[in-house]
Structure formats: structure tokens, C-alpha cells
Amino acid sequence: MAKKLIGTLKLQVPAGKANPSPPVGPALGQRGINIMEFCKAFNAKTADMEVGAPCPTVISYYQDKSFTMDIKTPPASYFLKKAAKIQSGANKPSRETAGTVTVAQIREIAEAKMKDLNANDIDGAMQIILGSARSMGIEVK
């Protein structure tokens, strides 16, 4: 018999830095998920990623207190800010420029994000990343 799914939980946890402190601990604890088991499994799965990169994580938890997790790649905005060497996007994106990135950097970001994007090919993924850059006030050269 299959395990009965109780619900799902979406968290954004820094890669390699999952610990029982807020916001991770309380969110998992109130749903009956073993916090230390999650932290160990998450940190092991994100060991090859850059430490501290925000990882959107979808946790499905079951009636027998077990869980599965799907760890996605960091958001496009994280990669764009890193490539442009800025802390945040522009306050007025259509009028201000927060930074600049090259088309090669956009392609690199699109290749890294390809599995999480709703695109058929790399050109479609690049268009999605270009739209994110435009909305953040990052100029593409």
C-alpha cells in the first residue's frame, strides 16, 4: 500500500546551512517532520552547491512521518545579482540600471537553470532569464 500524503511545504533554505533554528525548525516541527533527519539529508544533497545559495525546496510529508524533498536550483535573481556583482536590483527598473551582464553570462545562467525552467531549448531559457534581468533593472550587453 502506498504512503498517504498529508501535505507539501515550500521553503527556501540556504544550501548546506539547514539547521533546526527558525524558520526551518518550526515549519517542519509543527508538521511532525523529523527536523534533524531533514537537516542532514538536505545538507548532504546540497553539498556540491555553493554554500549559502538559496535553494527552493518542496517537501512532501506523509502520514508515517516520512518525507521526500525536491531541491530546485537557486532563483534566477540570485545568479543575476552574482553575475552583475550587485546586492539588489534597481528601485525603478525601467529608469535605473542596477548593473550589467553579458549575453554569455545569461547563457551560462540559462544552462544552470534549464531543468527548472519551462522552456524547450536554451534560447527559450535565455529569454526567460533576460526577462528577469530586465525586471531587476540589469542591462544586458
Curated annotation (Swiss-Prot):
UniProt keyword Magnesium, yes or no: no
Domain of life: Bacteria
Gene Ontology biological process terms, A to Z: translation
Pfam families named among the record's database cross-references: Ribosomal_L11, Ribosomal_L11_N
Alphabetical list of InterPro entries matching this protein: Ribosomal_uL11 (IPR000911), Ribosomal_uL11_bac-typ (IPR006519), Ribosomal_uL11_C (IPR020783), Ribosomal_uL11_C_sf (IPR036769), Ribosomal_uL11_N (IPR020784), Ribosomal_uL11_N_sf (IPR036796)
Keyword terms, alphabetized: Methylation, Ribonucleoprotein, Ribosomal protein, RNA-binding, rRNA-binding
Keyword Zinc-finger part of the UniProt annotation: no
Modification(s) after translation: One or more lysine residues are methylated.
UniProt xrefs under Gene3D superfamilies: Ribosomal protein L11, C-terminal domain (1.10.10.250), Ribosomal protein L11/L12, N-terminal domain (3.30.1550.10)
Cysteine disulfide partners in this protein: none
Matching SUPFAM superfamilies: Ribosomal L11/L12e N-terminal domain (SSF54747), Ribosomal protein L11, C-terminal domain (SSF46906)
GO MF, any single term: large ribosomal subunit rRNA binding
One annotated Gene Ontology cellular component of this protein: cytosolic large ribosomal subunit
Family: Belongs to the universal ribosomal protein uL11 family.
Assembly mode: Part of the ribosomal stalk of the 50S ribosomal subunit. Interacts with L10 and the large rRNA to form the base of the stalk. L10 forms an elongated spine to which L12 dimers bind in a sequential fashion forming a multimeric L10(L12)X complex.
Function recorded in the entry: Forms part of the ribosomal stalk which helps the ribosome interact with GTP-bound translation factors.
Listed HAMAP family: Ribosomal_uL11
Annotated protein name in UniProt: Large ribosomal subunit protein uL11
Organism: Ruegeria pomeroyi (strain ATCC 700808 / DSM 15171 / DSS-3)
Gene: rplK
